[in-house]
A protein has these predicted regions:
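Basic amphipathic alpha-helical segments that dock to polyanions
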Residues: 46-50
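Short alpha-helical segments that sit at the start of domains
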Residues: 1-14
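Conserved segment of winged-helix/HTH DNA-binding domains
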Residues: 70-96
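Short amphipathic alpha-helical interface segments
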Residues: 13-22
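C-terminal regulatory/oligomerization modules of transcriptional regulators
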Residues: 91-150
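Beta-hairpin "wing" of winged helix-turn-helix
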Residues: 52-61, 65-67
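A short alpha-helical element within helix-turn-helix/winged-helix DNA-binding domains
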Residues: 26-36
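Short coil turns linking two alpha-helices in DNA-binding domains
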Residues: 38-41
Length: 150
């Protein structure tokens, strides 16, 4: 389990799609301007999100929409859609050759692996518990507070 910028960009994209639903046509150019990246990056991720059945994309400049309610899309769904599955599923990358004759190096995996596994499980559970709707609501709340303070 490795988490790249593909994940945070995809979360940004889907949050924007829901946030601006009905106000703007959600195109790759529109999303690229929000993310501040090249539309090609956005189109690649749109393809992965479509493959995972999280979005529907209309041909041409028809735009993209979510295929289900934002309350039913979790961060873990998005992660699974855009991140490559690595062979070992490790979140943390260990240095390859700890010194086997060192009292610490010889047992560092036994010391640290259970804790790292717990951390990974907690991360996955938090991702599964966090919905896209929560993120959209938070963005709306923040923007409302900003507009009220001006």
């Amino acid at each position: 389990m490795r988490i790249s910028s593909r994940f945070t960009i995809a979360v940004h994209m889907l949050t924007a799609m829901e946030y601006f639903k009905g106000q703007y046509k959600i195109t790759s150019e529109f999303l690229a301007s929000s993310v501040c990246t090249n539309p090609v990056v956005i189109r690649r991720l749109l393809g992965k999100l479509k493959e995972a059945n999280l979005i529907k994309v209309s041909r041409g400049t028809g735009g993209a929409v979510l295929t289900r309610d934002a309350t039913l899309i979790t961060l873990y769904d998005i992660y699974q859609a855009v991140e490559e599955d690595d062979a070992d599923g490790a979140l943390f990358i260990f240095h390859e050759h700890p010194e086997p004759l060192c009292p610490v190096g010889s047992c560092i995996h036994e010391v640290l692996d259970p804790k790292l596994d717990s951390i990974k499980l907690a991360l996955i559970n938090e991702m599964k518990a966090t919905t896209l709707a929560e993120l959209v609501n938070k963005a709306q709340t923040i923007n409302l507070a900003k507009s009220n303070s001006n």
